[in-house]
Amino acid sequence: MKNPNHPSVDQSDRVVPYNLRQSGRTPTELLISTRVRKSPFWHLSHEAGCWRATVYNRIYHPRGYVRPEDGGAMVEYEALVNRVTMWNVAVERQIRVKGPDAEAFTDYVITRDATKIEPGNGKYAILCNDKGGILNDPVLLRLTEDEFWFSISDSDLLLWMQGVNISKKYDVEIDEIDVCPLQIQGPLSEDLMAKLAGEELRDVPYYGLMETSIGGADVVISQTGFTGEKGYEIYVRDAHENAEIIWNAVLEAGKEFGLMVIAPAHHRRIQAGILSCLLYTSPSPRDVEE
């Protein structure tokens, strides 16, 4: 007898048990609770038209602004590849490693050589468990000799990193800080960011950092993104106080460039060959091997 979970090549007779179905709508109403965090940009995303969201890093994550009847995700895509867009990516929680042994600890937990990352620069980083499984793939920012920020993807990296140093072998503080990023992505992003941060912004290299202020609020800017387009991230310090200042400043400056607030553009990410951690990776090397 043919197993119903072993379909034919064309998948036309595929049957997936209910307990394995990860896609599709949930036929229940989900309750809002303090177990899932609302970011400092959450209400601003709603004002911008956010109509659907998911949960990422235990934070509500906007995933759509243009409704299907108005063109949906392809309208957002058009704005991204032709003009400039702003994304609420506060779900990229910021884990700070600071102290005399910050470089040594960071070098221990990532797979690349942290000693080669100069202050004022960032790198894409991978963190693995003792079996070689991928735990997280943050953008790693080195602000100073003794301070690194891990801009993390979706996993409890803070607890893992604190656990790695439970013996206090490394003289560092490991904590989550009140910093939330926005992404500014698209071919006109450099012009918009130069208007906000000054012409020196144009000298920031790929994965380079710039510390400045916008509207009186302190920020760190990196030339990074999730699209393959030219783009930047604005890391807002003291985000719960300064989120509206930065958001509104970007909206105002962006009018000239046709700025649109959109959701993270996975269609463009796929075109660019950029992986999304835990969609294509796993803490279990066996999952990747199979």
Regions found by a protein language model. Name each.
Residues 2-282, 286:
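Glycine/proline-enriched, intrinsically flexible loops and inter-domain linkers
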Residues 288-290:
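N-terminal low-complexity segments that are often proline-rich with Ser/Thr-Pro
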